[in-house]
From Swiss-Prot:
SUPFAM superfamilies: Chaperone J-domain. PANTHER family: DNAJ HOMOLOG SUBFAMILY B MEMBER 2, SIMILAR TO DNAJ HOMOLOG SUBFAMILY B MEMBER 6 (HEAT SHOCK PROTEIN J2) (HSJ-2) (MRJ) (MDJ4). The modification Omega-N-methylarginine is found at residue 135. Its main location: cytoplasm. The keyword Cytoplasm applies. This is DnaJ homolog subfamily B member 6. Signal peptide: none annotated. Keywords: Chaperone, Cytoplasm, Methylation, Nucleus. It is found in: Cytoplasm, Perinuclear region; Nucleus; Cytoplasm, Myofibril, Sarcomere, Z line. One of its GO terms (biological process) is chaperone-mediated protein folding. It comes from Bos taurus (Bovine).
Length: 242
């Protein structure tokens, strides 16, 4: 039987934040769109990770799971045994894509994957769950909070977000925009994310396009293309001048 703690790679005493971090990492790793050559296994892993997160991120479900295992969530302990469970008629897991979209709040998750954490390279710390965790930049990061999530009733989705922030004392200005759209089967999924930072007068723009399993990353400095990467492989550039 699958152990949800093992699925997420966390200890049984893991905190709620540990559970979120583990889900975020594994959901991005095993998303079927990122594994076009191994889609069957990816879909299975992606579903397991979503189920584990659904249970372990909810205190009540996690308590029942810790005491009775998955059978407790199914509403029975087997062998005619009986225990007090709020899921006596069985707990129904949601579509893993719905869990995924809700977790990322409608934002483009793959742009977050590219930067590991939004603007971590710029500011050196992570965004809190409501955007107010980081000192001095809470109002900037809070721009990301409250973005509408997408429910399972929609057969397709089209999402976008943008944000702008600056730190006067650091001489740095950052701007990020992202859009994602695709069908419910995610077969036509496409995401475009652009992140720009200005450091000491130099404008550095990173554009990332993911479409049907192919990733293209362009980095420009002051409008000049400096690097191009396709599916993780850097491409040779022909520049007229340096």
């Amino acid at each position: 039987m699958v152990d949800y703690y093992e699925v997420l790679g966390v200890q049984r005493h893991a905190s709620a934040e540990d559970i979120k971090k583990a889900y975020r990492k594994l959901a991005l790793k095993w998303h079927p769109d990122k594994n076009p050559e191994n889609k069957e296994e990816a879909e299975r892993k992606f579903k397991q990770v979503a189920e584990a997160y659904e249970v372990l991120s909810d205190a009540k479900k996690r308590d029942i799971y810790d005491r009775y295992g998955k059978e407790g969530l199914n509403g029975g302990g087997g062998g005619g045994s009986h225990f007090d469970s709020p899921f006596e008629f069985g707990f129904t897991f949601r579509n893993p894509e719905d869990v995924f979209r809700e977790f990322f709040g409608g934002r483009d998750p793959f742009s977050f994957d590219f930067f590991e954490d939004p603007f971590e390279d710029f500011f050196g710390h992570r965004r809190g769950p409501r955007g107010s965790r980081s000192r001095g930049t809470g109002s900037f990061f809070s721009t990301f909070s409250g973005f509408p999530s997408f429910g399972g009733a929609f057969p397709s989705f089209d999402a976008g977000f943008s944000s702008f922030g600056s730190l006067g004392h650091g001489g740095l200005t950052a701007f990020s925009s992202s859009s994602a759209f695709g069908g419910s089967g995610m077969g036509n999924y496409k995401s475009i994310s652009t992140s720009t930072k200005v450091v000491n007068g130099r404008k550095i723009t990173t554009k990332r396009i993911v479409e049907n399993g192919q990733e293209r990353v362009e980095v420009e400095e002051d409008g000049q293309l400096k690097s191009l990467t396709i599916n993780g492989k850097e491409q040779l550039l022909r520049l007229d001048n340096k």
